[in-house]
Amino acid sequence: MNTKFPEAYVNFLLESNGGTPEEDLAFDFIDIASNKKNSTDIREFYIFYPEGESSYDDIIKVNYIMKSEGLVPEECLVFADDSAGNPICMKTGGENQERIFLCDHELENANNGYLLMSKVADSFNEFIEKLYIIE
């Protein structure tokens, strides 16, 4: 994975390297399909495993599969998912760099064939700030 990550995401990885949040977390976003406010949770942040180790939540494996199947653009880093299986990604290049998107695994963008992407935040820091504990 030859990608330059934003400093906020690098710091997050150094502190936690992903995994399941200790508390049930959610965030709000505007659903691009309905143009209405919606919310979802964080099931898991994907993990960077040491070379030779892997699991279903291996960030390198997940990104390889998502990109080779044409589900997300090459300049997206899928770094988490929600409990419905919707990937959460960050643009790491090109237009909208560093923005965070929720990808609807059931809907396809008719223009490019990728999963339909709803903007969540303009940066990883903003994304983290938008998270709240589910009561």
Annotate each predicted stretch with a short phrase.
Residues D104-Y132:
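Compact, glycine/acidic-enriched structural inserts
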Residues N86-G93:
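Broad, structure-driven detector of short, well-ordered beta-strand segments within folded domains
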Residues A80-D81, T92, D104:
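Pocket-edge structural micro-motifs
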Residues M1-A84, Y132-E135:
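A surface-exposed partner-binding patch
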Residues E95-I100:
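A short alpha->loop->secondary-structure connector
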Residues F5, Y9-F12, N63, F101, ...:
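Aromatic side chains
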